């Protein structure tokens, strides 16, 4: 078996190459002692097994104790500690000179190296030609030109791994005699300490470059003290010598012609990164994403809703009635399992549209610029601009967003990002928004969704600002970001990425929603006295009584006693936000007897015909929804016969619905998110996040509802608004003056 390490700069196509080499034969775990994801894969070449370990993307192998992320530390340590046969160094052909810096450090390990020169097609399109044979001769290792995203060059790269036993000699750097003598002395001291010659050579260079995490701590510190006494800036001298040698190589092997794409990128960046226009353009792109998701995706939502309700809810209910099944069985199967399947599948068009647009922004090159644009605004408040990149991931799911914070350099920035990310509206919340938009905001629903996303971002920024002023004081680290050239992503790649994200979401949502719907159906069928209720919903069921007990707590935000299913939805939503819509669908269907009505008037072919007919009908109204949302068509006249109709009667109009959505937006996303906060920070930060999210969710929802209804009951509204304001101030005071501040020294303790 051959074991190869895959390493390269960020955004060099390393993960794409890893997927191309290993296909589905991958395993995901964590590196020992840390929460950084470890990806390994394997493939067979004839009868020879080759295992690949994908290391985090890094620019350098120097692991400084200060300002190093967990990803960088893992990569730097892995090339020393792991047992492997060769290294695959992935290089972006468009940025050859920059990426060869890491290559020069890898050569100093003395291990076999294969250079995978990726993105050759893009380099050619930009007028860059590289003599790979000459580059191979100058480097002294195999150089394989590839196009990982098209699987071009992959077989040649695989074959090269069978013949990579030749050890690589380090590049000859032009150093002064004094500097070379210091390096030789370091090397000799390391050899006398018991290090092998090859590792002594590598360690001496890392120490000279300021690596404080390599080798034994006491011995390393003594060598570093001696280095400081030499009054030689070896780190600067080595870096300068590397760049000089790399420049010589690149001059010999690379020719660059006029690059139309660079001119286009420069011209477009003058607009996109404009001092005054950058932020409006950013908000316009976010607005377009919600416009696309709600209107384009929503045009197909009725098809999935009507067809799955016809098959799984009405169809199963009708079939069980023909078999004379008990009412509680019909409730469990039709309004439990059936409604769960219906709810899960109805998510697909809106979520898929959002994932597609996010992939478009990422692959086109705009997302990196979005982080750059937001950085200035966030740094003005002392917040890390780099944290915006993980927070954007939160639009898909808060869990990977929080885990992505580990790539940040400082502990303070990482913890700030962990605490800010839960307020980003994930795709599960978008599913809830879509349901309420259909029921309460038939005109301009995307404006409602955009406002919720914007409020979430503002609350995340506010949370970060409060923490910066209280428990996480300090200065934001500078943003160092590579801005890729703009390019047109292939439709195939966009669809593949959308499909991968969508499959994960539907699987995760379905396995939670369906069991929850079955449990809720059972609780709604069992009475307080232990009996089984009839097919008609009643207020004596266990679920009804539980909901009615808690509902008065939410009365100030417009949830009245008869709307107890909304309260149950909030409770189940703490497990996962995907469950909220399933809970509401299941309970409102049973409370409103939708199941019995549907089963009694079941028309299979009529339902399927209506499902297909909804697509052209919705698409025909798309123009007015896009260009003039205010005058878009009103809700379907038959809405009152559906779950949407029941919801619209139970909530206090659009005001009550929006207050409910504010609470859904701001309170804890799910138990998975809280568990990841516990893992990435500590238990105290987790409980702080839970308490803070509930306080701001309740206060914001109550203040909005009471403010909107102020003219109806001014005295009552004023009391609630003042009470919520004082409660929020009290919590802020606790953060500010608490004797148990969550200093950085406690953040690393996972207790």
Swiss-Prot record:
Membrane topology type: Multi-pass membrane protein
Binding site for GTP 2: 33-37
Residues reported to bind GTP: 118-121, 147-149
Transmembrane segments: 276-296, 341-361, 385-405, 422-442, 447-467, 512-532, 657-677, 685-705, 715-735
Single GO molecular function: ferrous iron transmembrane transporter activity
One GO term describing the cellular component: plasma membrane
UniProt-annotated binding residues for GTP 3: 54-57
Compartment(s): Cell inner membrane
Binding positions (GTP 1): 8-15
Keyword Membrane among record annotations: yes
Organism superkingdom: Bacteria
CDD domains: FeoB
Family indicated by similarity: Belongs to the TRAFAC class TrmE-Era-EngA-EngB-Septin-like GTPase superfamily. FeoB GTPase (TC 9.A.8) family.
Function: Probable transporter of a GTP-driven Fe(2+) uptake system.
Protein name: Fe(2+) transporter FeoB
Organism field: Legionella pneumophila subsp. pneumophila (strain Philadelphia 1 / ATCC 33152 / DSM 7513)
Gene: feoB
